[in-house]
């Protein structure tokens, strides 16, 4: 029996008999990766154990040599986390997955698994601000160069690739610019050059709206904090190996898969990348997703289809409504026919156009900030994908440290407001917006008065914890 076919009834890595494997996405959200619990638990149990007992010395040796899969140490193997990994791999159409502590950790683990000192990779310029900073600063500290491509043209990606390029990175729908690149065209460029295509599919909602692997993408990453968790309770990330890239064809470019000590490609074939992420990079960096966090994300997944259906319905209605509002200068929503990437949305998105809208108010920066401050129900925060409606003014928060030129190139205008539409009754979302619009028109600045006491108390606590006096002994 090869390693790829080894099964287990104790850690969620077992193969489900084909005749019982649920075919529909909505059913897979609840059942893929489950394993029989010895005590009969219907929910996936939380295995809060730092380490796991070996049956024998020989058993421990097999696990550590990866000639048998099983639980060793929760830094990189845990039964609860394994269920999450298997479920997300199935939902995305991959062969294996590696769950990590956050979306940012998923980015770093992926980069470290493929690139090293002297290497480079190519990324779309239109990526999440945190990812951009990782690529521009952290990768550079590791001796890895990121080459940003600002255009949508696949030929420009091809021109940036050389013999030291390890992969191309892009996002399904860029955050916050709502840019959709042609996955299949960029994939063709990558595979012609002998490198994998990686896609951050956070906005694709674990395959509900988009399954990039079906369109030539080789590796998918997620911030599981967003729609996967869905309730703003848990931070997590995941890397899904599509099993589509042939590492065996490129031993000189990817020697890490042909190391004579580990022989990842020879032993694990299509799962080689996922095995490297979990049993080498995650093991060594400790960017671990805890078992309780994994269970929270699994609970979130169970309602993902129901939530995303409502997210998409509300977003479409809000986008149309905003477009007609006299105070709104513009709306960016990939579901609108006049959006520059609407054809890409029709090609790559199913079940709807996502739940993120960007728009600007007449009155620019000040009006946008005033509007956010005036909201009473909608929450101003950096998060996305919550069941609750969330809003952000990027120019004064996530993109404040970027130059005005950079913000303009990324499509982040001073008046931009990013809206993550929740699943509330749409009448209440509109009502909150209407009262905030009224306050903007009146030019009110003394807003959220009921929160002043809470804000002052929080400021006092923060000063005690993080201020200069906190360092005194």
UniProtKB/Swiss-Prot annotation:
The keyword Ribonucleoprotein does not apply. The modification N6-(pyridoxal phosphate)lysine is found at residue 226. Disulfide bonds: none annotated. One of its GO terms (biological process) is cysteine biosynthetic process from serine. Its EC number is 2.5.1.-. Gene3D superfamilies: Aspartate Aminotransferase, domain 1 (3.90.1150.10), Type I PLP-dependent aspartate aminotransferase-like (Major domain) (3.40.640.10). Disruption phenotype: Significantly decreases loline-alkaloid production. PROSITE patterns: CYS_MET_METAB_PP. It comes from the Eukaryota. Keywords: Alkaloid metabolism, Pyridoxal phosphate, Transferase. Its cofactor is pyridoxal 5'-phosphate. Transmembrane segments: none annotated. GO terms for molecular function: cysteine synthase activity; O-acetylhomoserine aminocarboxypropyltransferase activity; pyridoxal phosphate binding. GO terms for cellular component: cytoplasm. Coiled coil: none annotated. Induction: Expression is induced in loline alkaloid-producing cultures as well as in planta. CDD domains: CGS_like (cd00614). InterPro entries: Cys/Met-Metab_PyrdxlP-dep_enz, Cys_met_metab_PP, OAc-hSer/O-AcSer_sulfhydrylase, PyrdxlP-dep_Trfase, PyrdxlP-dep_Trfase_major, PyrdxlP-dep_Trfase_small. Pfam families: Cys_Met_Meta_PP (PF01053). Loline alkaloids show broad-spectrum anti-insect activity, and different lolines may have different biological activities. In vitro tests of NFL, NAL, NML, and semisynthetic loline derivatives with long carbon-chain acylations on the 1-amine have shown that many are effective against both fall armyworm larvae and European corn borer larvae, but the effects seem to differ depending on the modifications. N-Formylloline reduces the weight gain of fall armyworms by deterring feeding, and does not significantly affect corn borers. Pathway: Alkaloid biosynthesis. It is an enzyme of class 2 (transferase). Belongs to the trans-sulfuration enzymes family. Sulfhydrylase-like protein; part of the gene cluster that mediates the biosynthesis of loline alkaloids, potent insecticidal agents composed of a pyrrolizidine ring system and an uncommon ether bridge linking carbons 2 and 7. Lolines are structurally differentiated by the various modifications of the L-amino group and include norloline, loline, N-methylloline, N-acetylloline, N-acetylnorloline, and N-formylloline. This is Sulfhydrylase-like protein lolC1. It comes from Epichloe uncinata (Endophyte fungus).
